[in-house]
């Protein structure tokens, strides 16, 4: 009796949740490469991006999104919320990422957005490795699931890559039988230029922590190949002179540290030597100016 192989499946899955629950860490873990920057600061992800996770059984095109939140005062917050909601258009399924042991109003908001979209929702309970009392997990899952419908529920640790195989198996069941949309070596739809800017922004968040002004973004002014060398020029935009001084640091030491670590990350990701220059410039009110946001690459 001959064995029949399972059909190949391929489809898109939106990764949704409130800020700082580990959506980007989960996306990177599933893709197997760094396509989305990560920090402890909420709202690290500001753009929709595709992470392409390819397995022998199929391919998942993951739409990593900005965290859904209630803050609507700044234009940047409104644009990011619209981007998160817009990521649900045309997807086959969605992942709602929450933090183990915690459910708040923003989690409820994210669930309502997914319910309105009418797509199958897989609940991913992340950071289970941080639970001090492991016996509290099952009562928490029962509480969250009460009155809410999920296609599957998966406790995971995205950081430690625990519980991901079972999650992938259930996600592949929710996408259609189809050929892969991308080549097996492709991991994202974003350009190297975009990723370079994100790596600088990641180091800004990691080096400055709570000192980092919220209204900070990065624009890549130059990205050029010079033989085996990549020459990259990055502008860090802030809204006030005082913020500029914070980013530069005493004697330029902080900016040098940011640039040095971002360059190493770029060389690792791009597989090439990088010459990186960084500047800090001021543009007042850019984070509440939709035209400026569009110029800096923020879109819905």
Curated annotation (Swiss-Prot):
> For the region G3, what residue ranges are annotated?
64-67
- Under the cellular component aspect of Gene Ontology, which terms does the record hold? cytosol; plasma membrane
Keywords from the UniProt entry: Cell inner membrane, Cell membrane, Cytoplasm, GTP-binding, Membrane, Nucleotide-binding, Ribosome biogenesis, RNA-binding, rRNA-binding
Q: Where is region (G5) located?
A: 156-158
Q: Which GO terms describe its molecular function?
A: GTP binding; GTPase activity; ribosomal small subunit binding; small ribosomal subunit rRNA binding
Give the start-end ranges of region G1: 17-24
Q: Which residues bind GTP?
A: 17-24, 64-68, 126-129
The listed locations are: Cytoplasm; Cell inner membrane
Key word Cytoplasm present: yes
Domain Era-type G: where? 9-177
Its main localization is cytoplasm
Q: Which residues form the KH type-2 domain?
A: 200-284
Instruction: Say which domain of life the source belongs to.
Output: Bacteria
Membrane topology per record: Peripheral membrane protein
Looking at the record, which segments are called G2?
Answer: 43-47
Annotated segments matching region G4: 126-129
Pfam families documented for this protein: KH_2, MMR_HSR1
- What processes does the entry annotate via GO biological process terms? ribosomal small subunit assembly
Which N-terminal stretch is annotated as signal sequence? none
Which PANTHER family does the record cross-reference, listed alphabetically?
GTPASE ERA, GTPASE ERA, MITOCHONDRIAL
Q: How does it assemble?
A: Monomer.
Q: What does this protein do?
A: An essential GTPase that binds both GDP and GTP, with rapid nucleotide exchange. Plays a role in 16S rRNA processing and 30S ribosomal subunit biogenesis and possibly also in cell cycle regulation and energy metabolism.
Question: Which HAMAP family has this protein been placed in?
Answer: GTPase_Era
Family as reported in the entry's similarity comment:
Belongs to the TRAFAC class TrmE-Era-EngA-EngB-Septin-like GTPase superfamily. Era GTPase family.
- Protein name per UniProt: GTPase Era
Q: Which organism is it from?
A: Xanthomonas euvesicatoria pv. vesicatoria (strain 85-10) (Xanthomonas campestris pv. vesicatoria)
